Amino acid sequence: MGARASVLSGGKLDTWERIRLRPGGKKKYALKHLIWASRELERFTLNPGLLETSEGCKQIIGQLQPSIQTGSEEIRSLYNTVATLYCVHERIEVKDTKEAVEKMEEEQNKSKKKTQQAAADSSQVSQNYPIVQNLQGQMVHQAISPRTLNAWVKVIEEKAFSPEVIPMFSALSEGATPQDLNTMLNTVGGHQAAMQMLKETINDEAAEWDRLHPVHAGPVAPGQMREPRGSDIAGTTSTLQEQIAWMTSNPPIPVGEIYKRWIILGLNKIVRMYSPVSILDIRQGPKEPFRDYVDRFYKTLRAEQASQDVKNWMTETLLVQNANPDCKTILKALGPQATLEEMMTACQGVGGPGHKARVLAEAMSQVTGSATAVMMQRGNFKGPRKSIKCFNCGKEGHTAKNCRAPRKKGCWKCGREGHQMKDCTERQANFLGKIWPSHKGRPGNFLQSRPEPTAPPAESFGFGEEITPSQKQEQKDKELYPLASLKSLFGNDPSSQ
């Protein structure tokens, strides 16, 4: 952090901290913005050390400026931060970011005019790499370096065809000829299916170029170059000298840039195939930090085949809509005009250990409260206990068994001697209003005597026959258990025979 924060020091740092982020806003630049810019440059494979000088800031701005219209919000924020830092290095007085960007663009326009004037005065053509001018004044081609090819192959091996491959290809192929671009494509060993898709896209674009730029009838005039066809732009039917001549003619025909656009168009289709996840499916997990969610969101957004207006709408709508409930509540409270920096600052603690502990405590309190309510509804909640009262001294907090006061004589209820409390007749009435002493028999609401039943004697219809003891026992069993035998149900019961 110290190395990153050492970009500015002394008076420049004071000037940096006086510049406002927005016109008329309260927030101002701080060290954390320099640290963030350094990390973003590392993420875009740029050297953070360039921030220490105004020339380095110019180089960074030159790399970022082509991506401003089609880039993400992070690229725009990085561009604005570097532009403000450039004004601080050049000691240009600015009040806010907007004024700094305007001042920087004015400086760029002035330098462009000077360059154009110098080119017109010397009547020289552009000398962009890899086409350079030798000591004899001739325009020669400088072949692409093995280091550049190695970096390109390494990106393909590590990233396959993820969205960041496209800006990496664009940076490595700056000013390249069609022959250089074909060399870069031929170094890709694997992913031949993707390469075949790329060839089909290039052939389609070449056919479209031939349709829109038909060849003029008749021979080419002496001293003039022929117009490039689609296959010439792709480098299959043109030589390196012809490509250099087209790119350095006046006016130039940028065959390298045209071919580069075709390749990027094909790479976009490949990235779409290798990244099948739709931006609609990117949702923040319940415990995922908001920063990681934003990274995944913009990475998928780069692979979307849509215009910049559609991507802006996706960012404004889906970024908030697909956040988890905790972050969504915070983002809606910020309002629709909140910047990405404000969103990430507001949601910084969501998903961390402190936030998890707070959410868990709230959930536990809710569960405990609901369980208490259920117990009270079911009648299991007994409420506060009643205080214990001593029968001996009449005080609360202990029983008569543990009472230290002198034992009270007689009944503890009426105070009279001669009986105990269990035999006390005072206010011991039943619900009929009658006093029931325990020594006078049964209570008044019970039957005081139990009469014996007076059933008539059993009649005998034996007509004098003699009854054997077994028959007597059978008759007695029938009287006691009328259904014990199966005769009444199935006739003769074989078990009784």
Curated annotation (Swiss-Prot):
GO terms for biological process: viral budding via host ESCRT complex; viral translational frameshifting. SUPFAM superfamilies: Retroviral matrix proteins (SSF47836), Retrovirus capsid dimerization domain-like (SSF47353), Retrovirus capsid protein, N-terminal core domain (SSF47943), Retrovirus zinc finger-like domains (SSF57756). A motif (Nuclear export signal) lies at residues 16-22. Keywords: AIDS, Capsid protein, Host cell membrane, Host cytoplasm, Host endosome, Host membrane, Host nucleus, Host-virus interaction, Lipoprotein, Membrane, Metal-binding, Methylation, Myristate, Phosphoprotein, Repeat, RNA-binding, Viral budding, Viral budding via the host ESCRT complexes, Viral nucleoprotein, Viral release from host cell, Virion, Zinc, Zinc-finger. Pfam families: Gag_p17, Gag_p24_C, Gag_p6, zf-CCHC. Residues 7-31 are annotated as: Interaction with Gp41. A zinc finger (CCHC-type) spans 388-405, 409-426. Residues 102-125, 437-497 are annotated as: Disordered. A lipid is attached at residue 2 (N-myristoyl glycine). The modification Asymmetric dimethylarginine is found at residues 385, 407. GO terms for molecular function: RNA binding; structural molecule activity; zinc ion binding. Residues 73-77 are annotated as: Interaction with membrane phosphatidylinositol 4,5-bisphosphate. Signal peptide: none annotated. Residues 8-43 are annotated as: Interaction with host CALM1. A motif (Nuclear localization signal) lies at residues 26-32. Residues 14-33 are annotated as: Interaction with membrane phosphatidylinositol 4,5-bisphosphate and RNA. The modification Phosphoserine is found at residue 145. PANTHER family: ENDOGENOUS RETROVIRUS GROUP K MEMBER 24 GAG POLYPROTEIN-RELATED (PTHR40389), PTHR40389:SF4. Belongs to the primate lentivirus group gag polyprotein family. Late-budding domains (L domains) are short sequence motifs essential for viral particle budding. They recruit proteins of the host ESCRT machinery (Endosomal Sorting Complex Required for Transport) or ESCRT-associated proteins. p6-gag contains two L domains: a PTAP/PSAP motif, which interacts with the UEV domain of TSG101 and a LYPX(n)L motif which interacts with PDCD6IP/AIP1. NDK, isolated from a Zairean patient infected with AIDS, and is a highly cytopathogenic strain. HIV-1 lineages are divided in three main groups, M (for Major), O (for Outlier), and N (for New, or Non-M, Non-O). The vast majority of strains found worldwide belong to the group M. Group O seems to be endemic to and largely confined to Cameroon and neighboring countries in West Central Africa, where these viruses represent a small minority of HIV-1 strains. The group N is represented by a limited number of isolates from Cameroonian persons. The group M is further subdivided in 9 clades or subtypes (A to D, F to H, J and K). This is Gag polyprotein. It comes from Human immunodeficiency virus type 1 group M subtype D (isolate NDK).
